[in-house]
Design a protein with these regions (language model features):
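Compact alpha/beta protein-protein interaction domains typified by the UBC
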Residues: 32, 36-103, 113-114
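Long, charged/polar, low-complexity intrinsically disordered N-terminal extensions
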Residues: 1-52, 63
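Glycine-centered motif in EGF-like
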Residues: 2-19, 77, 83-144
Length: 146
């Protein structure tokens, strides 16, 4: 029996196709397999992902762009590969995930390309500050916020 598609499936497929030319091709992003997604992020659930490399703040960096199952209604995530040792950089989780937004942050599902571009820019800015040691005080602020 053929798989039925919901409106959300169609929106996901449409949003991914919109990312192809302006972002994924430009970054020369390599698709991640479902096995890679489950292996690298066993405590999280992503529907699709891509890996790309670049120089950020003078450091060769590999990032994963990760789309949740309910993208474009939920923002994408970015993961640093390989994950740094814990507490190396502020706003980087143990599995390398970058903390760019608070949980439940609203995104515009009609603008998936703009959402990804903005979060990619935020990821680059965070890593530039981290590599330069400019945001080490954020550890203290994060600790105090809990």
């Amino acid at each position: 029996m053929p798989r039925s598609f919901s409106i959300d499936d169609e929106q996901f497929v449409r949003a991914v196709s919109e990312l192809e030319d302006p972002i994924l091709k430009q970054l020369a992003a390599r698709p991640l397999s479902s096995v890679e997604l489950m292996t690298q992020y066993p405590k999280k659930s992503f529907r699709k992902g891509w890996q790309f490399e670049g120089v950020i703040g003078g450091v060769n960096t590999t990032l994963n762009l990760l789309l949740p199952f309910d993208f474009p209604y939920t923002p994408p995530s970015f993961g640093l590969v390989p994950p740094p040792r814990i507490l190396t950089y502020p706003h980087v989780e143990e599995d390398g995930m970058l903390c760019l937004l608070f949980d439940g942050a609203p995104v515009d599902p009609a603008q998936p390309v703009e959402v990804v571009k903005q979060l990619l820019s935020d990821a680059v800015g965070l890593l530039e500050k981290s590599y330069a040691g400019e945001n080490q005080g954020d550890f203290r602020e994060e600790f105090l916020s809990y």
